[in-house]
């Protein structure tokens, strides 16, 4: 196994841990979202929301870095991430590059905007919860590609 494939395998293993942690956060947040009165949230609920937002963001970020590593292995120009996304779409890892970008915009918006608007914050959190399944699907398709193309075992 080349050094780059070993690095790719370690990224996939790390993604699996991140996926598990994100799943835990989803379970915690689903217990109290939507939130009727944000100021009344308990400290542990705020902590669960913060953990969910961070884990969601980091999971997508690391998934993107892993897709970039696959593109490098396949000798695709990775100077522009849009090229990586288009390549992942061709491999059928992603449904569409636009959907990936929508998820990225969502995570950026929830981390920077509307913190005083309960309705918008609820909508962002609920949409993020709904998009977890898409990210997990992209992750699984990336694992499948790496297993077929490189014989990598991501466990």
Residue map of PLM features:
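Solvent-exposed interaction patches of small proteins and small membrane subunits
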Residues: 1-155
């Amino acid at each position: 196994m080349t050094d780059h494939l070993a690095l790719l395998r370690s990224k996939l293993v790390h993604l699996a841990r991140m996926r598990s942690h994100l799943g835990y956060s989803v379970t915690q947040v689903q217990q109290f979202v939507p939130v009727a009165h944000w100021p009344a949230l308990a400290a542990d609920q705020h902590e669960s929301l913060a953990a969910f937002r961070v884990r969601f963001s980091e999971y997508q970020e690391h998934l993107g870095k892993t897709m970039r590593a696959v593109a490098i292995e396949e000798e695709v120009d990775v100077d522009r991430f849009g090229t990586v996304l288009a390549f992942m779409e061709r491999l059928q890892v992603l449904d569409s590059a636009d959907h990936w970008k929508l998820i990225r915009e969502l995570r950026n918006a929830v981390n920077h905007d509307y913190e005083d608007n309960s309705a918008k914050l609820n909508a962002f959190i609920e949409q993020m919860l709904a998009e977890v399944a898409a990210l997990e699907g992209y992750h699984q398709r990336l694992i499948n590609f790496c297993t077929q193309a490189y014989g990598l075992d991501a466990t």
